[in-house]
């Protein structure tokens, strides 16, 4: 009898352990990492002027044969697989983190260089939108929920809808009119490191920009309800654009890019992600 009870207790304990383990592991994850870029990489979709150089640099906007950036140029790159960012059945939302390094070089002083680059999430199979100050992800400056697009922009030109401070970081929700901005000082031609994190539980989107060359650090954060902004499945990408006037141009070079997202399959699932208040760069 004692042996039977012991077996029953062990069986029950094992069942509970498996249930807990299943709950911990009930998380849908996706991740990718490019420490450099390779021409012909099937995991990336290049749009517009975007190309990958033989030296492993992702150029979002065109460089002329004389080595100078071209005006009126727009380019984007998308991760080739869609990301499940929230689930309609369970109501769960993914936490995510992306990191990338880039540089912007402005060889011209007149007219003012333009326009910037942006990390964005939006509907799958989308095509580049208007360039210039719309950065390839919007077609006008109106607030329009049909865009279903979220972006973190690094804007170098003050358009009529922008704050007077440029350059600035902006959080864009269904509009190029940022819901929050933070000025930063462009370190011309120097590499910047970016970390963008979204914590689904607090709904806080947080971005950090660091210039290792100068030690300058810039941060921005805002509450964003991803489920009210984005479709269930999204493309994630980087987009850049130059200005509409001759020589209103700059380079938008990306050297590395990583992304990870964790979507719990139930509201009780444990998400094994890093501390979203920690920003190691």
Swiss-Prot record:
Which residues are annotated as pro-peptide in the record? 269-281
Keyword Calcium appears in the UniProt entry: yes
Q: Which UniProt keywords apply?
A: Calcium, Glycoprotein, Lectin, Signal
- Per its UniProt record, what InterPro entries does this chain match? ConA-like_dom_sf, L-lectin, Lectin_LegA_CS, Lectin_legB_Mn/Ca_BS, Legume_lectin_dom, Leguminous_Lectin
**Record has Calcium as a keyword:** yes
Q: Which SUPFAM superfamilies match?
A: Concanavalin A-like lectins/glucanases
Tell me the superkingdom of the source.
Eukaryota
Q: Which CDD domains match?
A: lectin_legume_LecRK_Arcelin_ConA (cd06899)
Q: Which residues are glycosylated?
A: 43, 139
Family according to the record: Belongs to the leguminous lectin family.
What is this protein's name?
Lectin
């Amino acid at each position: 009898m004692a042996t039977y009870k012991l077996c029953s207790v062990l069986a029950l304990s094992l069942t509970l352990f498996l249930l807990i383990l299943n709950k911990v592991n009930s998380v849908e994850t996706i991740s990718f990492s490019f420490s450099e870029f390779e021409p012909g990489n099937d995991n990336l979709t290049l749009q517009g002027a975007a190309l990958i150089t033989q030296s492993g640099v992702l150029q979002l906007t065109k460089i002329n044969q004389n080595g100078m950036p071209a005006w009126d140029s727009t380019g984007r790159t998308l991760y080739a697989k869609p990301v499940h960012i929230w689930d309609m059945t369970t109501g769960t939302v993914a936490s995510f983190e992306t990191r990338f390094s880039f540089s912007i070089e402005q060889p011209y002083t007149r007219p003012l260089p333009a326009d910037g680059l942006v990390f964005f999430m939006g509907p799958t199979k989308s095509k580049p939108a208007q360039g210039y100050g719309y950065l390839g992800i919007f077609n006008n400056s109106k607030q329009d929920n049909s865009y279903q697009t979220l972006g973190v922009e690094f804007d170098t030109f003050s358009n009529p809808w922008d704050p007077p401070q440029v350059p600035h970081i902006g959080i864009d929700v269904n509009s190029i009119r940022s819901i929050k901005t933070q000025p930063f000082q462009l370190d011309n031609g120097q590499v910047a490191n970016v970390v963008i994190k979204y914590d689904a539980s607090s709904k806080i989107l947080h971005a950090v920009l660091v210039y290792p060359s100068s030690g300058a650090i810039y941060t921005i954060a805002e509450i964003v309800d991803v489920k009210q902004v984005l479709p269930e499945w999204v493309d994630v990408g980087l987009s850049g654009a130059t200005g509409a006037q001759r020589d209103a141009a700059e380079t938008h070079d990306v050297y590395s890019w990583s992304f990870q997202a964790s979507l719990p399959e139930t509201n009780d699932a444990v998400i094994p992600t890093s501390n979203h208040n920690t920003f190691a760069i």
